[in-house]
């Protein structure tokens, strides 16, 4: 499974985070970690997500860019993760 670090800049509305997380889930990605902080102007937020999926991150990138409140999406890093099964 691939892990991707995604940075999203968006307008600060109560429903914005919900919409971003719904798109991530509907596109088949799992949230491994998340950090959200208000931008310096207090009207925008910066969301840092680490997501995992065998799917291409390009689909998630294009779908997040279509959201009304999203101003910018950047894919910063991709890494491969291995899953261990213990008996």
Curated annotation (Swiss-Prot):
Gene Ontology terms: biological process: amino acid biosynthetic process; branched-chain amino acid biosynthetic process; isoleucine biosynthetic process; L-valine biosynthetic process
Enzyme's top EC category: transferase
Cofactor(s), by name: Mg(2+); thiamine diphosphate
Segments forming domain ACT: 5-78
GO cellular component: acetolactate synthase complex
Coiled coil: none
Alphabetical keyword list: Amino-acid biosynthesis, Branched-chain amino acid biosynthesis, Magnesium, Thiamine pyrophosphate, Transferase
EC number per UniProt: 2.2.1.6
Catalysed reactions, semicolon-separated: 2 pyruvate + H(+) = (2S)-2-acetolactate + CO2
Chain ranges passing through the membrane: none
Comment on bound cofactor: Binds 1 Mg(2+) ion per subunit.
Keyword Nucleotide-binding: no
Entries under PROSITE patterns matching the protein: ACT
Name of the featured protein: Acetolactate synthase isozyme 2 small subunit
Species of provenance: Escherichia coli (strain K12)
């Amino acid at each position: 499974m691939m892990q991707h670090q995604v940075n999203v800049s968006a307008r600060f509305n109560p429903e914005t985070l919900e919409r971003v997380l719904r798109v991530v889930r509907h596109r088949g990605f799992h949230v491994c970690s998340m950090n959200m902080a208000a931008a310096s102007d207090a009207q925008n937020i910066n969301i840092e997500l680490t997501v995992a999926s065998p799917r291409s991150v390009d689909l998630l990138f294009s779908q997040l860019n279509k959201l009304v409140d999203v101003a910018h999406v950047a894919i910063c890093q991709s890494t491969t993760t291995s899953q261990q099964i213990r008996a």
